[in-house]
A protein has these predicted regions:
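N-terminal Rossmann-like dinucleotide-binding module
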Residues: 1-48
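Nucleotide donor/acceptor-binding cores
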Residues: 2-4, 116, 142-145
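Short, Asp-centered acidic motifs that coordinate Mg2+ and/or phosphate
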Residues: 32, 52, 68, 146
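Conserved SAM-binding strand-loop segment of SAM-dependent methyltransferases
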Residues: 50-57
Length: 186
């Protein structure tokens, strides 16, 4: 089996968490990382044993060192990077949330048109237990008329990107609320 060489765009908290997940996966390795600042990319690369660091996501996509891109950036720039990766022949794993339905449709069209895979980063929908829950609902509950849901986490300081509407147009509700909304429609 060929090893899938990942490039990670972004070096924040979720990108650090994802590094361990990629390394634990069979036939996967992190081959490159990009950040707006080279020193940040190099620090991430050193921490996670990544051989290539870039200060431009476009240069990383254009390189031949990666087969797939994990996009862990603010929502405001995610679509552009996902589409560029697809056009560059790279498979795309885009972190959630996405800006809008039309945005996701453009990303999936770019992936389809370029023969690459697309997945969103809502981890639980790709987990086998989600299929079990759906089957249980179908077998025992039938149509669900109402859903009550809660999700919380510590946002940390006010420097968190979720407080910046230019970077995260939907703010914390787009990030945390995404889980609740996705669970309801799944």
């Amino acid at each position: 089996m060929k090893t899938l060489r990942w490039g990670i765009v972004g070096t924040g908290g979720i990108a650090n968490s994802m590094a361990g997940m990629i390394e634990m996966a069979d036939a996967s390795e992190i081959a490159a990382v990009s950040s707006r600042r080279m020193e940040t990319a190099q620090r991430y690369a050193k921490k996670h044993g990544v051989p290539n660091a870039f200060d431009s996501w476009q240069e990383m996509i254009d390189s031949d060192v990666v087969d797939a891109i994990y996009v862990a950036t603010p929502t405001s720039v995610r679509e552009e990077i996902c589409i560029a990766a697809a056009r560059g022949g790279k498979h795309v794993l885009g972190e959630k949330p996405f800006a809008s339905l039309p945005s996701v449709q453009r990303i999936t069209a770019a992936c389809r048109d370029n023969g690459v895979a697309f997945m969103d980063g809502t981890h639980f929908v790709h987990h086998p237990r989600t299929l079990d829950i759906k089957q249980h609902r179908a077998d025992r509950l039938g149509f669900v008329w109402s859903v009550a849901s809660a999700f919380q986490f510590n946002l940390g300081d006010r420097g968190n990107i979720r407080f910046n509407p230019e970077l995260e147009p939907m703010g914390a509700i787009g990030d945390a609320g995404w889980y609740n909304m996705r669970a309801a429609v799944e």
